[in-house]
Amino acid sequence: MKTTLVSTPLAQLETELLAVFATDTAPAADMANGTQASPQVQLLTRDAALDAAVKTILASGDFKAEANETLLIHAPQGMAARRLLLVGAGKQARFTVHALRKAAGSAVRAARAKNIREATLAIPQSQGLDVTATARALGHGAAVADFDPDFYRSDRKDKSLQSLTLALPEATDANAAEAGLREGIALGESQNLTRTLVNEPGNRLTPTLLGEQAKKMCAEQGLRCQVYSSEKLHELKMGSFWSVTQGSDEPPALIVMEYTPEGAAEGPVLGLVGKGITFDSGGLSLKPADSMEKMKYDMAGAAAMIGAMRAIALLKPRIKVISVICSAENMPSGKAQKPGDVQISMIGKSIEVLNTDAEGRLVLADGLAYAKQLGATHLIDAATLTGAVMVALGGVNAGVFCNDEEAWQHFEAALGQSGEKFWRLPLDEEYREMLRSPIADIKNVGGRYGGASTAAMFLKEFVGDTPWVHLDIAGTAWMDEAKPWMSSGPSGIAMPSIVEWVRSFAR
């Protein structure tokens, strides 16, 4: 996608589509009295020609500026643009940069639906946001919207946006806007890389091929990358990781990516660890057939780390980052591990495997330990780990666990930047009692209840005192229904927040 900044007056701006954002300034509904004020639409761009072009439409009440609402006007009077798109950003009182990001995505999705390949977004004036944050939100939202998962349709039509222009208001700092746009595009395209990887079926993205994708990205972005297989797992005594892969004919991949900027010799080293199960049948604890095809998404945590490392390479925070991905297939066979087996992890802790479908924690246990061995002083992992987090939080919030308040404060700050929805869940010591094994140091499942917390508590055993954040994205990594600003399918969840977590340490 080609990106451009212009300061041409809107009336003179020649473009296939000009998108202008608006909010509703009417007070919120009074629930006690059952009253609802009529919408009062306010354009976020002040321009006399624009006001004249939309006066009749706004007076009609056909456009209410509801969040992500769009209304297309052909040949707007008095303007050079071929089409004018009004895009709602919701209530003015609740307007945020994240509402603007989604509105930008809604504008691009509306353009794609009409096979429009070139669009201009008018940067809102003021709204309490600096121009860098505004341009970044527009770029990020536009890039994420410019994606569809129908890669393998023989009749697939390329609807991707070829050109995106931001129209600057008068007296706008063009350099600041350009920096924001560049950041937003970097984040959005990296999130789309994550989504592309998650979308790949298991026969087209084995652990070996995932390693090749990581190496390709790292070569393009100037990152170090090493991909190891079975021999390295045995050398490192990663018995927990190996136990998952032994049932498959596909070899595992231990992927290590490194970002080392100049001037980062001292200070924290951040470790990003991803679960990369490219297909999860459940192993001998076989999953039900219903929806098993979605288990190609069980490497969404690994994909988030690959996307995050790309964005980190582009945004260049001054802090060292190491990423470890543990990738395998979890398959049943005569070689597969059996319920009741005892495995020895990299740190020597013995694990009684009661359920082979609780495999994500087995690969992450060794991945977290290895990231520490490589020098990570702070850890974050992402995994489609438990169905329990889906029961607890549905598809709205992802789960987050943390063993350190300072690391948590960094992640809270990251969420303020990314706008993603995570909900902190408990790590009380009582959950550890549910993992006691009569024959080993720990068992890999804790019973029917509290499954997201017992899974997190299992992982906590392998991080020790290292500050650590655990993201359980099982309920949010895949969307069955499209949003106005984003297609259905892989969401790319966690990647933006991981990047912002890293950047929070560098500020």
Swiss-Prot record:
Give the required cofactors. Answer: Mn(2+)
Report which reactions are catalysed by this protein: Release of an N-terminal amino acid, Xaa-|-Yaa-, in which Xaa is preferably Leu, but may be other amino acids including Pro although not Arg or Lys, and Yaa may be Pro. Amino acid amides and methyl esters are also readily hydrolyzed, but rates on arylamides are exceedingly low; Release of an N-terminal amino acid, preferentially leucine, but not glutamic or aspartic acids
Q: Where in the cell is it found?
A: Cytoplasm
PROSITE patterns xrefs: CYTOSOL_AP
One annotated GO molecular function is: metalloaminopeptidase activity
Cofactor note from UniProt? Binds 2 manganese ions per subunit.
**Main localization category:** cytoplasm
Query: Which key words tag this protein in UniProt?
Result: Aminopeptidase, Cytoplasm, Hydrolase, Manganese, Metal-binding, Protease
- Short name of one Pfam family: Peptidase_M17
Q: Which residues bind Mn(2+) 2?
A: K275, D280, D298, E359
E.C. number: 3.4.11.1, 3.4.11.10
The record's InterPro entries line, in alphabetical order, gives: Leucine_aapep/pepB, Macro_dom-like, Peptidase_M17_C, Peptidase_M17_leu_NH2_pept, Peptidase_M17_N
* Catalytic site positions: K287, R361
User: One GO term of the cellular component aspect?
Assistant: cytoplasm
The answer to whether the entry has keyword Endoplasmic reticulum is no
What's a GO biological-process term for it? proteolysis
> Which positions are annotated as binding Mn(2+) 1?
D280, D357, E359
By sequence similarity, the record places it as follows:
Belongs to the peptidase M17 family.
* Functional summary from the UniProt entry: Presumably involved in the processing and regular turnover of intracellular proteins. Catalyzes the removal of unsubstituted N-terminal amino acids from various peptides.
PANTHER family for the chain: CYTOSOL AMINOPEPTIDASE (PTHR11963:SF23), LEUCINE AMINOPEPTIDASE-RELATED (PTHR11963)
Q: Please state what the protein is called.
A: Probable cytosol aminopeptidase
Query: Which species is listed as the source?
Result: Acidobacterium capsulatum (strain ATCC 51196 / DSM 11244 / BCRC 80197 / JCM 7670 / NBRC 15755 / NCIMB 13165 / 161)
